[in-house]
Amino acid sequence: ISILQEIDKRAGQIGKVQDVLLEFNISGEETKTGIEPDAFEEAVEAAKALPNIRVCGLMCMAPQFGDLEKTRPVFREGHELYKKLQKKFPEGQIHILSMGMSHDFEIAIEEGANMVRIGTAIFGARVYR
């Protein structure tokens, strides 16, 4: 929520309403960031109170399993949160469900994603220097 507040402050300073996606840590992995699903209501209310923030949807990542089918329940829960989020905002405002990366985007799409992040599939693995 502190990040939302900072974005709101900076957007307000330049007279902008910033579109954002709320990131949820559905899998509960310690290596992932994001809002825990049990903090959903608190996060939604905090976002709605910020005048320079426009929530457009949510994003989440599944753990990397050896068996891709194990990602399906995570993406399914992401879709459920997305539908719940849609009910909290004006009709049409929540329109992005970003789930799935280069290795698991097919299952994410099957489970309702309408935005995927496939940079590695397009550009290759990152080279860290």
Regions found by a protein language model. Give the residues of each.
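Conserved alpha/beta-domain cores
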Residues: 1-105, 109-111, 123
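C-terminal helical cap(s) of enzyme catalytic domains, especially alpha/beta-barrels
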Residues: 109-129
